[in-house]
Swiss-Prot record:
UniProt name for this protein: Polyprenal reductase
Disulfide links within the chain: none
PANTHER family: DFG10 PROTEIN, POLYPRENOL REDUCTASE
Function: Plays a key role in early steps of protein N-linked glycosylation by being involved in the conversion of polyprenol into dolichol. Acts as a polyprenal reductase that mediates the reduction of polyprenal into dolichal in a NADP-dependent mechanism. Dolichols are required for the synthesis of dolichol-linked monosaccharides and the oligosaccharide precursor used for N-glycosylation.
Organism listed in the record: Saccharomyces cerevisiae (strain ATCC 204508 / S288c) (Baker's yeast)
Length: 253
């Protein structure tokens, strides 16, 4: 079967949208039935493997080092550089490149992952998928000339403020005594202000291309679930002593 260029782009966009639909549905299924898939870092609670464990159980509980987070940003930075080569005059490409490069720097030089800090293999694959499809839809939109080559100043200012705030919050987390309760800044009000920053950062992409609404929905859904996991962990460990009243969005969640 032969597809012309227009059909190929159309079906690629359909596949992009479908992947987010499947991904979001999978999040809720995992939350209800397979919580191990959503745990990482301090919220990851390993269970002893019996020698009689089934192969399926071993696959379900397989983990990788949390330091592999850097792979997400190596990938995003590389794909952004390739996109910059072809579309150097579009501000949104520089914005995504800058975000990827900053997160790579933080992962390598700010955040400190111990050898015991781990995440489920599914979390790792989802990260690779997310940054791949993010750059895929960016390139498709650029190719279709549906993205303006001008800078949205309001969105850019919000992006810069949220990026700076996220960096400062990551510094606080990096300087914590292992698995202690973070304090200061917005940590007094929400357990995961760095997740809130991430949501704000991705919301600033919408003025450039409405297709990014799916990436925003994904970020809101996945990080809200992670923030609720973190809040539950804090409540269990610190018995509600000075735990922030909200998980991610002040006065809402």
């Amino acid at each position: 079967m032969y597809f012309d260029e227009e059909q190929l782009l159309k079906y690629t966009i359909y596949a992009y949208r479908l992947s987010f639909f499947v991904g979001i549905c999978s999040l809720f299924i995992a939350k209800s039935c397979l919580p191990e898939f959503l745990q990482y870092g301090k919220t990851y609670r390993p269970k002893e493997n019996s020698k009689y464990s089934s192969i399926l159980e071993r696959i379900k509980k397989f983990t990788v080092p949390k330091a592999y987070f850097s792979h997400f940003y190596y990938l995003a930075t590389f794909l952004s550089l390739v996109t910059l080569y072809f579309y150097p005059k579009f501000p949104i490409v520089w914005i995504i490149f800058g975000h990827s490069l900053r997160r790579l720097y933080e992962t390598l030089y700010v955040l400190h992952y111990t050898s015991n800090s781990r995440m489920n293999w599914s979390h790792y694959l989802v990260g690779i998928w997310f940054y791949s499809v993010l750059l895929l839809i960016l390139n498709i939109s650029l190719y279709k000339n549906s993205i303006p080559n001008t800078l949205n100043m309001n969105a850019f200012i919000i992006f810069c403020i949220a990026s700076w705030d996220q960096y400062k919050n990551h510094v606080i987390l990096a300087n914590l005594v292992k698995y202690s309760l973070p304090t200061g800044r917005l940590f007094r009000l929400v357990c995961c202000p760095h997740y809130l920053d991430e949501i704000i950062i991705y919301s600033t992409l919408l003025p450039y291309e409405q297709e990014f609404y799916l990436t925003l929905v994904w970020v809101i859904t996945s990080l809200t679930i992670s923030a609720l996991e973190t809040k539950n962990y804090y409540r269990h460990k610190f018995k509600d002593n000075h735990v922030a009243p909200y998980a991610i969005i002040p006065f809402i969640i």
